[in-house]
Amino acid sequence: MLDAKYVKDNLQQVAEKLATRGYQFDIAEFEAQEQKRKHLQERTQDLQSQRNTISKEIGQKKAKGEDTSDIFAKVNQINEELKIIEKELKDLQDTINQTLLSMPNLPADDVPVGKDENDNVEIRRWGTPREFHPEAPAKDHSDIGEILKMIDFKAAAKVTGSRFMVLKNKIAKLHRALSQFMLDLHTEKHGYEELYVPYLVNNDSLYGTGQLPKFAANLFKLEGDFEYSLIPTAEVPITNLVRDEILDTETLPRYYTAHTPCFRSEAGSYGRDTKGMIRQHQFEKVELVHITTADKGEESLELLTSHAEKVLQKLNLPYRVMKLCTGDMGFSAKKTYDLEVWLPSQNTYREISSCSWCGDFQARRMKARHKNPSMKKPELVHTLNGSGLAVGRTLLAIIENYQQEDGSIMVPDALIKYMGGISVIK
């Protein structure tokens, strides 16, 4: 959530920045609402002052034994008007708050202005994509998995529906090995604290990280008496651990990681990536979250991104780093790097991680602050998050990049010990 005072003091600048994100901010309407709010507040304060004055007068008259019935009538009249105005003020404030909640984060100054993924900027590449012989082109991961009888989309469709999968045998083991490898790397080498978090969250948590109110259609909600939703990403439960907290500055930065399933309805994705494992309703991810101070926010993004990159480097998977443009960033992001892994069957790079610096945008929603003895008052923390990595997409990248002409899959060296010594899947 943007700072309301900053928005009011910089209306034109805010409107221009929001426009680069595809959000049309109606300045005239917002100013009219603000003027009305100020008028109602002033009227409320005026009536409260009148009531206080009359109350003192009542006390004085009672002390003298004088009749106060006419004054009580005035008080009742003021109270009735206050009820009406206070409700009107509350409704108007709710409308203003909903407008603020609907605004995406303002982009950092170095974020390229653009409309969509075509305007993203490549920062760097790592690794060299493998060349396949023209007579033996790269197979798609889903075809390889089905030939090996270790990926079964038909069984998943029978059990549940489309955009689900059943993994079997050594590919299921490889999927498990990947999550263990990622967690070990981040906890043992990068200094993260491992967490086990709920897979169901309440609405306050979803508001805190920015999924609500705008992205309700992307959530799977429980029916019945519980107002819970399945997590779309572990970013939600992890980041909300600091909601309504005042942290000791000395304890920052905090680095958290967790391996969880994620659930997304993929609303708006009809017809995209219908084949294979790229876009699933249920998938697993190792999430990275940083909680830090404002002066360390941007450098923390570089660090978090490097941690996600290290997974790809250890697995020897070619990738590139993209700086997202204003029109392609996530709602809560101030600046984002996407990691895109090479998929030989598609002859292109595809997203495997999105690493974002959210500034104080989420912290303001969550009332997440920090303080030390030298500070006059608590300050908002800065939050960052990224995938380190999406397990399913890493799995399919390994299947495609490590496929052999005989239909087998070589296991990356870094994973052999997690596979119990298995070096080939066939």
Curated annotation (Swiss-Prot):
InterPro entries: aa-tRNA-synt_IIb, aa-tRNA-synth_II, aa-tRNA-synth_II/BPL/LPL, Ser-tRNA-ligase_type_1, Ser-tRNA-synth_1_N, SerRS_1_N_sf, SerRS_core, tRNA-bd_arm. ATP binds at residues 264-266, 351-354. GO terms for molecular function: ATP binding; serine-tRNA ligase activity. One of its GO terms (cellular component) is cytoplasm. GO terms for biological process: selenocysteine biosynthetic process; seryl-tRNA aminoacylation. It comes from the Bacteria. It catalyses: tRNA(Ser) + L-serine + ATP = L-seryl-tRNA(Ser) + AMP + diphosphate + H(+); tRNA(Sec) + L-serine + ATP = L-seryl-tRNA(Sec) + AMP + diphosphate + H(+). It is found in: Cytoplasm. Coiled coil: none annotated. PROSITE patterns: AA_TRNA_LIGASE_II. Pathway: Aminoacyl-tRNA biosynthesis; selenocysteinyl-tRNA(Sec) biosynthesis; L-seryl-tRNA(Sec) from L-serine and tRNA(Sec): step 1/1. Residues 36-66 are annotated as: Disordered. Belongs to the class-II aminoacyl-tRNA synthetase family. Type-1 seryl-tRNA synthetase subfamily. Catalyzes the attachment of serine to tRNA(Ser). Is also able to aminoacylate tRNA(Sec) with serine, to form the misacylated tRNA L-seryl-tRNA(Sec), which will be further converted into selenocysteinyl-tRNA(Sec). Homodimer. The tRNA molecule binds across the dimer. HAMAP family: Ser_tRNA_synth_type1. This is Serine--tRNA ligase. It comes from Francisella tularensis subsp. holarctica (strain LVS). The lineage of its organism: Bacteria, Pseudomonadati, Pseudomonadota, Gammaproteobacteria, Thiotrichales. The gene is serS.
